[in-house]
């Protein structure tokens, strides 16, 4: 029997310590948005709950200011 499906190795964090979560940092925010324009879940992003909250509010602010699209319909 397998012990578990999860690997025991440590994954690298998806946000480096020198990166700040800001609505103006669109290159960082695009990593956390799916192809359809949805905010990815915390488990997919490997973020803490505090980081996920900050990312979500930054993405929403960037959408309102037209820095990020609400939906990504580029075909």
From Swiss-Prot:
Any single GO molecular-function term of the entry would be:
structural constituent of ribosome
Recorded superkingdom: Eukaryota
Keyword vocabulary terms for this entry: Chloroplast, Plastid, Ribonucleoprotein, Ribosomal protein, RNA-binding, rRNA-binding
Report the subcellular localization: Plastid, Chloroplast
Q: Which PROSITE patterns has this protein been placed in?
A: RIBOSOMAL_S18
Enumerate the InterPro entries for this protein: Ribosomal_bS18, Ribosomal_bS18_CS, Ribosomal_bS18_sf
Q: Which GO terms describe its cellular component?
A: chloroplast; mitochondrial small ribosomal subunit
UniProt cross-references to Pfam families, sorted A to Z: Ribosomal_S18
GO BP term, pick one: translation
Q: Has UniProt tagged this entry with the keyword Ribonucleoprotein?
A: yes
According to the record's subunit comment, the protein's assembly and interactions are: Part of the 30S ribosomal subunit.
PANTHER family this protein is in? 30S RIBOSOMAL PROTEIN S18, SMALL RIBOSOMAL SUBUNIT PROTEIN BS18M
UniProt lists the family membership as follows:
Belongs to the bacterial ribosomal protein bS18 family.
Q: What is this protein called?
A: Small ribosomal subunit protein bS18c
Organism, per UniProt?
Answer: Adiantum capillus-veneris
Taxonomy of the source species:
Eukaryota, Viridiplantae, Streptophyta, Embryophyta, Tracheophyta
């Amino acid at each position: 029997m397998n012990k578990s499906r999860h690997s025991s190795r440590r994954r690298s964090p998806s946000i480096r310590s020198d990166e700040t979560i800001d609505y103006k940092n669109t290159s960082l925010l695009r990593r956390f948005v799916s192809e359809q324009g949805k905010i990815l879940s915390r488990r997919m992003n490997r973020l803490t709950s505090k980081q996920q909250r900050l990312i979500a509010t930054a993405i929403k602010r960037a959408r309102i200011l037209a820095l990020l699209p609400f939906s990504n319909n580029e075909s």
